[in-house]
Amino acid sequence: MSIRAEEISALIKQQIENYQSEIEVSDVGTVIQVGDGIARAHGLDNVMAGELVEFSNGVMGLAQNLEENNVGIIILGPYTEIREGDEVRRTGRIMQVPVGKELIGRVVNPLGQPVDGLGPINTTNTRPIESPAPGVMDRKSVHEPLQTGIKAIDALVPIGRGQRELIIGDRQTGKTAVALDTIINQKDEDMICIYVAIGQKESTVRNVVETLRKHGALEYTIVVTASASQPAPLLYLAPYAGVTMGEEFMYNGKHVLVVYDDLSKQAAAYRELSLLLRRPPGREAYPGDVFYLHSRLLERAAKLSDAKGGGSLTALPFIETQAGDVSAYIPTNVISITDGQIFLQSDLFFSGVRPAIDAGTSVSRVGGSAQIKAMSKVSGTLRLDLASYRELEAFAQFGSDLDKATQAKLNRGARTVEVLKQGLHKPLRVEKQVIILYALTRGFLDDIPVVDITRFEEEFHAWLDSNATDLLEEIRTTKKLADDDKFAAAINGFKKVFVASE
């Protein structure tokens, strides 16, 4: 069998005609320096600020410093395998995280990867972690209440859906407990909660997850964790990942609560990155744009207009102070960004007043308009009662011969402090808060011994569940105070069966 030359040439021609060349062009640079989670690369001339880049071993990085002859990159993962001379290529993408209802009930890292051992998260939706906050015309005034279940907050510093309320205090003053109680209280409220743990011990995060699971709150909660052992870039990105996951629900008309625990550690991580990138340091060695770090995060919390679906994203940022110093750089920055703050004081905490909320310095700038009418009526005099009690308490230590009016104020104040105390993970429905505060402010508790107030309240709530369900239902549905006669009948009815301790 002989093969003719023309057949061979015809076959070659056919192969040439069918040949398609796919040339993949990518911008490639070279690592010239690496260490401490930072790499510098030469040759990435067209890279965007905030663009994802990929190292030759598959680890991703984020382009941050665009300089004349090199690019400063923060490495999002282990950096020990990256060497000088390694290749680094542009991806053309900016940082995105997975979003959607598939994340609910899961524990993820700031890149959206699951860390709870429950398998992969089956979602294809993603959102960029840096996105502009809603504009003025896309927003609406805060008018719906977000019930925390904590009497001292719902009565004195009410929070509305779409508000930013700072929780500030020293370490070990119960900041995380306030957030967990608020999340637990959102059961049956059609609220999605996101808890962002920044720079915490992994054992602490584990305890938080178990607490949420025990109270059935993990069914509507996403936990984003960047623990203390993780590189600084992940601590810096964690809050942005959390708010991005929340925005997906907000723009779909849902209500979201995001807790950032805590932003002091994020600021410290950002300071570390900035100093390693050789950015000029400012006050307390923080970079000049540390205010923008927090403002662009917290401005993404909003109550959207009806045209945008009417969703909301409420932010509860935490700041840890040193020895109660709220005039430091980061605390003053975040106080000026938020719509109010709740101060937790260590001396109150250690004296047994828990939650240790300082009513004098805590304020809510927009939450008052979101408070239900019943609550605003019964809590009107609380702040004054507490303030005059604290003032008179100091004088009462010097003299024993006090007039009747002063003694009455001291007695009312002592009972107010007792009523505002609350057990850990025992959030209270708003209708029960209204009734006990009504009893307090209208003088029904003045003849109950101070030592019995807590027991009186617990037994009263149980009694209401079986004997005054119609009164509870009326407050819950109308959100207004019922007739004084109904309240008096319920409170006096219970006082008849309550046995005071000797």
From Swiss-Prot:
One of its GO terms (cellular component) is proton-transporting ATP synthase complex. One of its GO terms (molecular function) is ADP binding. Residues 115-135 are annotated as: Disordered. Its EC number is 7.1.2.2. Coiled coil: none annotated. ATP binds at residues 169-176. The record marks 362 as: Required for activity. It is a peripheral membrane protein. Its main location: membrane. Belongs to the ATPase alpha/beta chains family. PANTHER family: ATP SYNTHASE SUBUNIT ALPHA, MITOCHONDRIAL (PTHR48082:SF2). NCBIfam families: atpA, PRK13343.1. Produces ATP from ADP in the presence of a proton gradient across the membrane. The alpha chain is a regulatory subunit. This is ATP synthase subunit alpha. It comes from Bacillus anthracis. The lineage of its organism: Bacteria, Bacillati, Bacillota, Bacilli, Bacillales.
